[in-house]
């Protein structure tokens, strides 16, 4: 196993560890009839009364003055037992449907229809607040963080599978990272089944894979000399490489979105070790991927230089420069694509979350 493969295996282990931690934390802390993990966007009762006094016969100046005075008291924070929470009829719920929160964020609160009874106990309305929006942060972790971490892990595993298939059958630059075609899993299971059940040695698929090895060597030499030209002449190979690249960057972007736990409204109620673990996970994954990319690029450059020396001994410098420039160009395109995806995810994260997770 090469160094790059070891680093990617470590990235998989880190992703699995982070996912297990999130599932454990949600399962351990999900307690019914508990408001400690909920965040409420509230407005004081006096401000809400001012908003209710807006009438059609008021002047524009008066309406703006009342709206400006009533907009200030809106606050977002955890459940405060010194306050009386009254759920507004049009209060919105974040991250999960209402039926999953009835036993948690709605506990120890009153409905707007109970306002008359509440005002009898608290006639001054000083400690009464109206809930405009609320979120169950355990549901946030489960319906967003866990799903995102699972999707990132699955996409990264799919990338590793596609990458292994390419190194086994498709073009590659680093000759040290190629996989023998005879190690194809179908060849192994076919040979094993023939020996166990039919008591014979099945070698046809193995011979066919040896022929593929010869063809693959020719493809590798063409790919090493002119990478961009090879992709232009073989659009299917370009499509498969694009799928591999998309899976890779999509998994990295999905993994990086776990940092939202430090910036979303739920960050005020989630414990510090959850937020610190998210930073540690993203930093470790980023370090592993950077080291893996540097090592992989170094190997590809060395392999391309060796291939150019074998095939074109009279034009080594030109071949090496062409390969290095093509690789740098591809890396720049990959980096630009990643930056655009991250910017788009940050700008339209709410729409993306609504469409993907519901």
Curated annotation (Swiss-Prot):
Key words, A-Z: Glycoprotein, Host cell membrane, Host endosome, Host Golgi apparatus, Host membrane, Membrane, Signal, Syncytium formation induced by viral infection, Transmembrane, Transmembrane helix, Viral primary envelope fusion with host outer nuclear membrane, Viral release from host cell
Membrane topology note: Multi-pass membrane protein
Keyword Zinc on entry: no
Subcellular location: Host cell membrane; Host endosome membrane; Host Golgi apparatus membrane
TM stretches of this protein: 142-162, 236-256, 274-294, 324-344
Main location: host cell
Residue numbers on the Extracellular membrane side: 34-141, 257-273, 345-358
Protein purpose: Glycoprotein that probably modulates membrane fusion events during secondary envelopment of cytoplasmic capsids that bud into specific trans-Golgi network (TGN)-derived membranes. Also plays a role, together with gB, in virus-induced cell-to-cell fusion (syncytia formation). Seems to block fusion of virions with infected-cell membranes.
Protein name: Envelope glycoprotein K
Organism: Psittacid herpesvirus 1 (isolate Amazon parrot/-/97-0001/1997) (PsHV-1)
């Amino acid at each position: 196993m090469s160094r790059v493969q070891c680093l990617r295996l470590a990235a998989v282990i880190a992703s699995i560890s982070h996912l297990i931690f999130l599932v454990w934390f949600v399962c351990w802390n999900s307690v019914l009839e508990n408001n400690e993990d909920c965040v409420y966007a509230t407005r004081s009762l006096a401000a809400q009364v001012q908003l209710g006094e807006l009438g059609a016969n008021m002047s524009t100046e008066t309406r703006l003055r009342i709206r400006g005075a009533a907009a200030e008291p809106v606050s977002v924070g955890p459940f405060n037992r010194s306050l009386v929470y009254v759920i507004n009829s049009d209060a919105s719920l974040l991250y999960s449907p209402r039926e999953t929160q009835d036993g948690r964020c709605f506990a120890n609160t009153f409905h707007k229809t109970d306002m008359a009874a509440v005002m009898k106990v608290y006639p001054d309305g000083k400690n009464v607040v109206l809930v405009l929006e609320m979120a169950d942060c355990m549901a946030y972790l489960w319906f967003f963080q866990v799903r995102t971490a699972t999707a990132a892990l699955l996409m990264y595993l799919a990338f590793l599978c596609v990458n292994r298939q390419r190194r086994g059958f498709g073009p590659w630059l680093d000759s040290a990272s190629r996989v023998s075609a005879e190690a194809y899993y179908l060849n192994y299971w076919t040979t094993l089944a023939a020996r166990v059940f039919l008591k014979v040695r099945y070698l046809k698929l193995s011979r066919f894979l040896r022929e593929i090895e010869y063809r693959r060597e020719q493809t590798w030499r063409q790919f090493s000399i002119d990478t961009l030209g090879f992709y232009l002449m073989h659009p299917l190979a370009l499509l498969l490489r694009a799928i591999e690249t998309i899976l890779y960057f999509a998994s990295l972007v999905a993994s990086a979105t776990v940092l939202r736990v430090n910036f979303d409204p739920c960050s005020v109620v989630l414990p510090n070790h959850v937020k610190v673990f998210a930073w540690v996970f993203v930093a470790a994954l980023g370090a592993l991927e950077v080291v893996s990319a540097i090592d992989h690029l170094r190997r590809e450059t060395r392999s391309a230089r060796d291939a150019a020396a074998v095939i074109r001994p009279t034009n080594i410098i030109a071949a090496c420069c062409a390969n290095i420039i093509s690789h740098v160009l591809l890396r720049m395109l990959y980096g630009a694509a990643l930056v655009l995806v991250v910017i788009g995810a940050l700008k339209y994260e709410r729409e993306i979350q609504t469409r993907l997770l519901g």
